[in-house]
Amino acid sequence: MLSPLALALSSNAAHADFRVCNATQSLVGVAIGYRAKSGWVTEGWWHVDPSTCKTLIEGALSSRYYYLYAEDAERGGRWDGPVNMCIAEKEFKISGVQDCFARGFQRAGFQEYDTGEQASWMVQLTDEPTTAGGNAGNATGTQ
């Protein structure tokens, strides 16, 4: 299992967003889940090249909790967690997290990130081994 690290952002960040940085040497596909006004939503795939970052949500964060799932497109590893949500093989935006298979989707375990009252958040995906109990995740935000 691969490890996500969440890094703190300085309080003078230029803009608010939710970003994922890929600190590996492989292409990574990323999916995000969150609660919208209409209910649960999952979206993917963002392709994040090695040693780059990609913004998944632009602007100030409107939810406190966000959920990430990512796959190493070249070596087959993944960054996952205990929260089951729906995904699809191709680009997707799925409403709801129940009955994934019955609705023609796949199910994956997402890692939860509590962004608190932060306006910005960044997760860094690394090759580092995970600690007991799951993936390590460091997240920071700015107000």
Regions found by a protein language model. Give the residues of each.
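Bacterial N-terminal signal peptides
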Residues: M1-A8
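Intrinsically disordered, low-complexity segments enriched in small/polar residues
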Residues: N12-C21, Q25-G29, R35-T55, G59, ...
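Short, Lys/Arg- and Gly-enriched loop/turn segments at beta-strand edges
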Residues: S62-L68
